[in-house]
UniProtKB/Swiss-Prot annotation:
This is Glycine N-acyltransferase-like protein 1. It comes from the Eukaryota. It comes from Homo sapiens (Human). GO terms for molecular function: glutamine N-acyltransferase activity; glycine N-acyltransferase activity. Keywords: Acyltransferase, Transferase. InterPro entries: Acyl_CoA_acyltransferase, Glycine_N-acyltransferase, Glycine_N-acyltransferase_C, Glycine_N-acyltransferase_N. Its EC number is 2.3.1.68. Belongs to the glycine N-acyltransferase family. GO terms for biological process: glutamine metabolic process.
Length: 302
């Protein structure tokens, strides 16, 4: 694999990946952040250049110092020939199979190569899947070489009803001092490693909230290093009050103004969330969200 660290090549890759949306969105979003300051110190590997078949995004070596930190030890993959991913993944120079890690992608067909590679390394793997939800303007990037999102006005979604703030509630950037609050209410959180990860997401990536009467966030949303919007949550007392809808509208408007790509994943059985985000123009993509969590035998969580 070739390490791609030239800014011109990374920009060319970003534009090229747009042609493979939605399957490439995980990698496309990661390259966006790499091209805009690279706050999570990620690096890009391709099998060849300028023509390529596979792209892998991984943290730089100095980031992966904790063998148990699967929030940091994340590999994001896209392949034009996913059935051929096995040989690449078996290479210990590419994936550190001695660590607990995650492999994320939007191609189910990556799974066979991952399963073969993990079996050869005596690594336990757990597969989880969810629906990938996107908006029309994200899909339009596929047909455009500009790799820019349309403005909020161009999408035609009525946002006036959500724009105005209600008394005692204020839309704001989510402050890193509330990382603990987010961690305590995130299903995948509630531990020290997740707290560290959340702090980085809030500090370095777009995150928004609605402050309640006491000046404390009552609804919030964040973004991960691959431009996936997540951790969205409303405190129980303030649910069904329109606060999360107001946060989402303002947040999405900001992302579009800054030309930041975004998408979300929702469990198929979570019909309430699917209905909720549907009002903002999200719909099911032609592919799904996939994550393979891998544990070396000496680090299995049981």
């Amino acid at each position: 694999m070739i390490l791609l660290n030239n800014s011109h090549k990374l920009l060319a890759l970003y534009k090229s990946l747009a042609r493979s949306i939605p399957e490439s969105l995980k990698v496309y979003g990661s390259v966006y952040h790499i091209n805009h300051g690279n706050p999570f110190n990620m690096e890009v590997l391709v099998d060849s250049w300028p023509e390529y078949q596979m792209v892998i995004i991984r943290p730089q070596k100095q980031e992966m110092t904790d063998d148990m930190d699967s929030y940091t030890n994340v590999y994001r993959m896209f392949s034009k020939e996913p059935q051929k991913s096995e040989e690449v993944l078996k290479n210990c120079e590419i994936v550190n199979w001695k660590q607990r890690l995650q492999i994320q992608g939007l191609q189910e067909s990556l799974g066979e190569g991952i399963r073969v590679a993990t079996f050869s390394k005596s690594v336990k793997v757990e597969h989880s899947r969810a629906l990938l939800l996107v908006t029309e303007d994200i899909l339009k990037l596929n047909a455009s070489s500009k790799s820019k999102l349309g403005s909020w006005a161009e999408t035609g979604h009525p946002d006036d009803e959500f724009e105005s703030e209600t008394p005692n509630f204020k839309y704001a950037q989510l402050d890193v001092s509330y990382s603990g609050l987010v961690n305590d209410n995130w299903k995948r959180g509630k531990n020290e490693r997740s707290l560290h990860y959340i702090k980085r997401c809030i500090e370095d990536l777009p995150a928004a909230c609605m402050l309640g009467p006491e000046g404390v966030p009552v609804s919030w949303v964040t973004m991960d290093p691959s431009c996936e919007v997540g951790m969205a949550y409303s405190m129980e007392k303030y649910r069904r009050t329109g606060n999360m809808a107001r946060v989402m509208v303002r947040y999405m408007k900001y992302l579009r103004q800054k030309n930041i790509p975004f998408y979300i994943s929702v469990l198929e059985e979570n019909e309430d969330s699917r209905r909720f985000v549907g009002q903002f123009g999200f719909f099911e993509a032609s592919c799904e969200w996939h994550q393979w969590t891998c544990y070396p035998q000496n680090l299995v969580p049981f």
